[in-house]
């Protein structure tokens, strides 16, 4: 029985290893890796005249993951096609009880005529359930090829310096959700900082309540158009403390 059990465990470990390193290309395909779910998330693919995208895990352990996504999209130049992302799995947590959200993110992008962002995407709601979301907070490490955030006016409302980076802050509605987007003034391919500092800024300066719950924390890329593109995340980590 011990031999059989060990054999079964080795078989499962081998299968898991292969699964983690196999790219997936379906619209809603996912892979669980460490503390994350990695999503292909081709939610806007119908806005493209042609294209495809595949995503895969390179390595993962606990709160650290390395991954990549490759895509080509044509048509619908003003529309996002997808949001391949690594989503941290956690229970919704009230902002007032969070002391820090340390994160590191090292990435590179290659391809032709890329219009895309590289961004954290986080949601705040009145309860720990994501269905109560009222705010979407995006932190753009890059706005490539003229990509731009949701904005009511097209103008910045502030230019704060947070975690040693100067950001253009925009706001606007997305349905019933208010979106705040911090867009780095220069592309930041090697980020290390405390994501809680963005929430502290919004609480102190934009009237966001610290009684709200952080319900979602994702990091990935939103492509508009481009060809033979690849986002390669060599290092990503995040935790809520």
From Swiss-Prot:
EC number, UniProt record: 3.2.1.151
Catalytic activity: xyloglucan + H2O = xyloglucan oligosaccharides
Recorded GO CC terms: extracellular region
Signal peptide (from-to): 1-16
Highest taxon, organism lineage: Eukaryota
pH dependence of function: Optimum pH is 5.0.
Temperature curve summary: Optimum temperature is between 50 and 60 degrees Celsius.
GO molecular function, one term: xyloglucan-specific endo-beta-1,4-glucanase activity
Location within or outside the cell: Secreted
GO BP field: cell wall organization; polysaccharide catabolic process
Record's keyword terms, sorted: Carbohydrate metabolism, Cell wall biogenesis/degradation, Glycoprotein, Glycosidase, Hydrolase, Polysaccharide degradation, Secreted, Signal
Primary site of residence: secreted
Broad enzyme group: hydrolase
Glycosylation site residues: 47
rRNA processing found in the keyword field: no
Protein's job: Catalyzes endohydrolysis of 1,4-beta-D-glucosidic linkages in xyloglucan with retention of the beta-configuration of the glycosyl residues. Specific for xyloglucan and does not hydrolyze other cell wall components.
Family the entry assigns: Belongs to the glycosyl hydrolase 12 (cellulase H) family.
Protein name: Xyloglucan-specific endo-beta-1,4-glucanase A
């Amino acid at each position: 029985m011990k031999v059989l059990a060990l054999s079964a465990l080795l078989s499962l470990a081998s299968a898991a290893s292969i699964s983690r390193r196999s790219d997936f290309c379906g619209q809603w395909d996912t892979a669980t890796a460490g503390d994350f779910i990695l999503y292909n998330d081709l939610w806007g693919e119908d806005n493209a005249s042609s294209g495809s995208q595949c995503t895969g895990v390179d390595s993962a352990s606990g709160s650290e993951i390395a991954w990549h996504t490759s895509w080509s999209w044509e048509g619908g130049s003003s529309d996002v096609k997808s949001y391949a992302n690594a989503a941290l799995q956690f229970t919704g947590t009230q902002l007032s009880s969070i002391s820090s959200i340390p994160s590191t993110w090292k990435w590179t992008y290659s391809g032709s005529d890329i219009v895309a962002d590289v961004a954290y995407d986080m949601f705040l709601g009145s309860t720990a359930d994501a269905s109560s979301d009222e705010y979407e907070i995006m932190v753009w490490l890059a706005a490539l090829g003229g990509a731009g955030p949701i904005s009511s006016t097209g103008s910045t409302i502030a230019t704060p310096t947070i975690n040693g980076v100067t950001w253009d802050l925009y706001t606007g509605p997305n349905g019933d959700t208010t979106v705040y987007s911090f867009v780095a003034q220069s592309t930041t391919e090697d980020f290390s900082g405390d994501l809680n500092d963005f929430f502290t800024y919004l609480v102190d300066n934009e009237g966001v309540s610290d009684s709200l719950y952080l319900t979602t924390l994702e990091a990935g890329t939103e492509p508009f158009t481009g060809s033979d593109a690849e986002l390669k995340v060599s290092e990503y980590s995040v935790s809520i403390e």
